[in-house]
Amino acid sequence: MAKLAAFDMDGTLLMPDHRLGEQTLTALKRLRERNITLTFATGRHVLEMHHVIGEFSLDAFLITGNGTRIHSLEGEELYRQDLAPEAAEAVLHSKWDTQASMHVFNDGGWFTGQARPELLKAHAFSGFHYQLCDPKRMPAHHVTKICFCGDHDDLRRLRIQLNETLGDRAFLCFSAMDCLEVLPVGCNKGAALAVLSQHLGFTLQECMAFGDAMNDREMLGSVGRGFIMGNAMPQLKAELPHLQVIGDCRHQAVSHFLTHWLDNPDLPYSPE
């Protein structure tokens, strides 16, 4: 029996309309009744996630900003890592050949230079909102991450530019087909989960994890049992072909698996 369960949010626990379904909530609460520790491992900001776990009365550790922050059940910061200031400076002040919008995150929130109301749909359930400002005027110190949102092919070309400029000063990954993230070196959900597991006295082999995107790769590949969503990015399935693929987030597939696992732990699982 696993001791720690880690869940990505968008495309995994959340349905396509970015809501947490009732079946999913029931399954999570059943895990807690079995004394299984929960952690939500997400690219979302900790300010938003505190609202989410408060609204649904969920006791969970938080890995936020794609591994840049870890918070305890009580909201205490257990770990933090920011982009190297020179890397943040380079991203903020370079001229990029892209149509993608730039978004900057720090402990104060989410900042962008142009209104993108379509991006707020993913945050409607929490009310989390960007703040408009000129990114070039933002201090390069204490930047958690920077992300670019736009067309996938455009972002692939941008990734080449960013790699050429940043080299090994940052870690780049796609958290969705339309979102490219610039993160601190060595920062990912898997590394953060290793820190949290050690803090709790667990091994990664005693963890299970669920995800759908390339920012879940390290986490899914490092735990005792990793599960890929049926709606996952093709690149993730190709990178981790040995992991079991479950159903689609639109059908609350995580809850379907967990219910089976809790009721029939010794029987093989099929998403059908």
Curated annotation (Swiss-Prot):
What the entry lists under InterPro entries is as follows:
Cof, HAD-like_sf, HAD-SF_hydro_IIB, HAD_sf, HMP-PP_phosphatase
Q: Where is the active site?
A: D8 (nucleophile)
Cofactor(s) recorded for this entry are:
Mg(2+)
SUPFAM superfamilies per record? HAD-like (SSF56784)
PROSITE patterns for the chain: COF_1, COF_2
Which keywords does this chain's UniProt record carry? Hydrolase, Magnesium, Metal-binding
**Class of this enzyme:** hydrolase
Segments crossing the lipid bilayer:
none
GO MF terms, alphabetically ordered: 4-amino-5-hydroxymethyl-2-methylpyrimidine diphosphatase activity; magnesium ion binding; phosphatase activity
The chemistry this enzyme catalyses reads: 4-amino-2-methyl-5-(diphosphooxymethyl)pyrimidine + H2O = 4-amino-2-methyl-5-(phosphooxymethyl)pyrimidine + phosphate + H(+)
NCBIfam families on file: Cof-subfamily, HAD-SF-IIB, PRK15126.1
Say which family it is in. Belongs to the HAD-like hydrolase superfamily. Cof family.
What biological function has been recorded for the protein in this entry?
Catalyzes the hydrolysis of 4-amino-2-methyl-5-hydroxymethylpyrimidine pyrophosphate (HMP-PP) to 4-amino-2-methyl-5-hydroxymethylpyrimidine phosphate (HMP-P).
Under the heading PANTHER family, the entry gives:
HMP-PP PHOSPHATASE, PTHR47267
Name of the featured protein: HMP-PP phosphatase
Q: Which organism is it from?
A: Klebsiella pneumoniae (strain 342)
Protein's gene: cof
